[in-house]
Amino acid sequence: MQSNAEMTVTPASRPRLTRIDIARGVALIAMAIYHFGWDLEFFGYMAPATTAHGGWKLFARCIASSFLFLVGFSLVLAHGRAIRWEAMGKRLLQIGAAAAAISAVTFYMSPDNFIFFGILHQIALASVLGLLFLRLPSVVTLIVAAFVITAPFYAQSDIFNQMWLAWIGLSTVPPRSNDYVPLFPWFGAVLIGIAAARIFKRFNWLPILSGGIKPAFLQKPFTFIGRH
């Protein structure tokens, strides 16, 4: 996710948006809970495919959506006025290295279901593509988001069934992977985050996000997790 420096574009003029940190912290905790369930399933303590159906599947999709929404929102906060190429490049290298490591490790452990385009791969790609929307009107970004989210319902084709095109997300046969977060429809969540951040900036709503939460004792741990 975004670094501290990237989250605060002009620290002297705007307080840190604590509720963004808290939201990220909650998402990270939710991700840990889901992966704990996945581990229980993997080691035989839960029935096979438990986390791939029903409430667990919905839980996973909510987690991914929240992460990607925050990626888009934070992209505007960090680069909305001017793209900070050095910070962007450093962040992409970090995320790209982590994504490559996950692909390598999962290929070694489970070659039939390895993670070739998971959440980190999506974040890396979306962080680059999202730059194209930083100056566009929010309504245009939301229209594109709607197209991206709905495309898998009407734009699927056998052409995309080839493994090297699976990252796009328009194949007619879903590829096997332990974590699959393709461009379509998931980039749509990033675009919604970008549009939301631009709307918040336009109407001067960002100060709303600088407050805390109740109960207060949860604020510090959630904020710490979200920042680090």
Per-range role (PLM):
Residues M1-H228:
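Alpha-helical transmembrane segments and their immediate juxtamembrane cytosolic regions
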